[in-house]
Amino acid sequence: MSRKIARCVFASVALLILSSTGYAAGDANAGKEKANACTSCHGVDGQGSEPNTKIAGMSVGNFKKAMQAYKSGERNHAMMQMFAKKLSDQDVEDLAAYYTAK
């Protein structure tokens, strides 16, 4: 019985490790370095002011969804589409981590 439990624990840990290795989480420090282009419209800390959106404190999911929508053209804003199309997936992850922490 204890061998069966040990195998289950081992399998569970292995699955957790394998499932997390393919995901590149955002790096807030790298995001801070990449955020310079955002400051002219959204402010130094992402607080924004009308008509620009507040991105500080935005959830990672919402930030990523918005950037993808600008990249694909689903959201129509010429300036944001131009910036978003230049961002790699890792750039978006890093920026999301940075602004979520604000």
Identify the meaning behind each predicted range:
Residues 1-10:
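Bacterial N-terminal signal peptides that target proteins for export
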Residues 18-21:
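N-terminal signal peptide c-region/cleavage motif recognized by signal peptidases
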Residues 23-33:
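Cleaved targeting-peptide boundary
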Residues 28, 46-75, 81:
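Gly/Gly-Pro-rich "capping" loops immediately C-terminal to redox-active cysteine motifs
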Residues 29, 57, 86-90:
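Soluble non-cytosolic domains of exported or imported proteins
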Residues 36-44, 95:
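The canonical Cys-X-X-Cys-His
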Residues 41-47, 100-101:
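Detector for the c-type heme attachment site
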Residues 66, 70-72, 83-102:
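C-terminal capping alpha-helices of c-type cytochrome domains
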